Amino acid sequence: MSGFHIVRISSAILLAIGISSAALAQQSLERIVITYPSRSIASVDLYIAQDRGFFRQEGLLADVVQVRGNIGVTALLSGDVHAINNVGTIIRAMERTDLPAKVVSQSLKKNLFWLVTKPDVKSLRDLKGKVFGTTTLGGSQHLATVRLLQKAGLVPDKDITVVIGGDVPAQLQSLLAGAIHLAALSPPTVILARDKFKLKIHGSTLDDLPNLQNGLAVSEKLLRERRDFVKRVLRARSRAHRYFWENERGTAEVLANYLKVELPVALESYRLARPAFTANGLATDQEVEEFLRADAEVLKLKEPVHAAKIFDFSVQREVNQELGLK
């Protein structure tokens, strides 16, 4: 697990970047710093690429740093990190403003969240006046939950108070403590909520519209000036992605190790999450269009943003051709 650091504030990113300097000098590997927002199966491709040596095969020494989504976006734009995994957060920022960044790969085509409450909440309608905890305001977890609450007949802006609740495991603890009343949990945490704590699950975002939650986003400057570097990163992640699809047991072992859960929980997490992942690091044109149209409605935009403003899958397509990924 060398190279994985969990940090809470942006200043710690710089500390994490410096940790591997000695190893870098000894092994002649080029550093890549990638952020991710929450401990869950959604970032499994990063765990696999790290654990199974795919980053090193590309001559990369990966520091994978946990920070809140909006902090990751700020760090990307300032050049403190090379890439971010939580593309949903930066997509929402790009839909509303002009940011010099591009989403270059897409690993998830559906959100991986299950709405969870204590057992006394019989339906989502009972949450009126209650508190929902999320990782990032305006991020994938937040907006996916908003859509499900709307379907249940609530007006989230008026009926629900939204607070920052930490990452998914922290949200479970807040839910158990009564600090929040609703959490949107990903595997394996949702399995622990169901089996260990007997909490109530109200529905899944897997049944919702396409939602491009995780992938890889880089600055336009990095993509323009260091395209080969970006390609090496995508090649490592694509090998990890292929490993995910072809090796259930190995993927579950990686999850169990990184997320500190028992192997049966990791196996169920894999099987629950598998349908949400793309086959080749690409979202289809239809999935992108549906996603942007739904986002425009939730964000109250006049019209959907053009896909070309946000996505550039050209390097991922080159990698897919090289690796024979369909």
What residue ranges belong to the model's regions?
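Pocket-lining segment of extracytoplasmic ligand-binding domains
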Residues: 88-89, 168-259
